[in-house]
């Protein structure tokens, strides 16, 4: 501990590394989410003059355009994107130099400042030292808040997928308002049947993320005294 690990503890180095790794994944996810939103907006423009029936409680209500449906899909995801961007900024506050419980024992202020500067230079991100290192070492609410935002995004994404499945139902005895791309043969016994496999796969991925959020919540709930030892399962 006199050389490579000087001024460090698992309780500051590990949380710092995981938060920055999550932030890196966040940036990649946002770029993919932007592509999805752009695709939905493109379809909204394409279908702006296509009339369909609007429905409440699955019953016919009033006419609308198919473009309005796709614009609403895009807007709901855009809203959640903004929440994710806002909540992700907490990952840029690190506790390097906090050492064991946040008091900074066996560390120095100069070390903390040097760490933050080195991380900024390496990543080009606006990384800062947490205001309260004891709180930052014991509390994992940044992960909880971000996971909640992911859960909400996936809940809305499930709604989009469910609507696409309903609108593509049929073709003879369902709504048959849209045609989803044929990704694979749908049945070995019913020739020509095509299943909405992409929305179904996305739904299942979302269910996993929503389940992970429960795990993150329980992990955050298990924080005791000066350290949350459940961060590995939360990450």
Feature map (PLM): residue ranges:
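Conserved, well-structured ligand/cofactor-binding cores
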Residues: 1-235
């Amino acid at each position: 501990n006199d050389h490579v690990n000087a001024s460090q503890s698992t309780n500051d180095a590990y949380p710092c590394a995981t938060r920055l790794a999550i932030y890196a994944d966040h940036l990649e996810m946002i770029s993919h989410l932007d592509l999805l939103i752009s695709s939905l907006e493109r379809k909204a423009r394409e279908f702006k003059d296509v009339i369909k029936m609007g429905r409440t409680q699955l019953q016919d209500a009033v006419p609308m355009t198919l473009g309005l449906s796709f614009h609403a899909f895009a807007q709901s995801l855009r809203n959640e994107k903004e929440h994710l961007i806002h909540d992700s900024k907490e990952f840029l506050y690190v506790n390097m130099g906090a050492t064991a419980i946040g008091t900074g024992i066996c560390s120095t202020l100069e070390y903390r400042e040097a760490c933050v500067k080195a991380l900024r230079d390496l990543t080009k991100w606006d990384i800062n030292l947490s205001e309260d290192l004891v709180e930052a070492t014991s509390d994992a609410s940044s992960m909880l808040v971000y996971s909640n935002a992911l859960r909400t995004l996936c809940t809305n994404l499930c709604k989009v997928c469910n609507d696409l499945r309903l609108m593509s139902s049929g073709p003879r005895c369902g709504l048959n308002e849209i045609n989803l791309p044929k990704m694979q043969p749908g049945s070995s016994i019913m020739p020509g049947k095509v299943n909405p496999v992409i929305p179904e796969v996305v739904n299942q991925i979302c269910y996993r993320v929503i389940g992970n959020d429960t795990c993150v919540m329980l992990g955050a709930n298990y924080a005791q005294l000066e350290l949350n030892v459940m961060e590995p399962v939360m990450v």
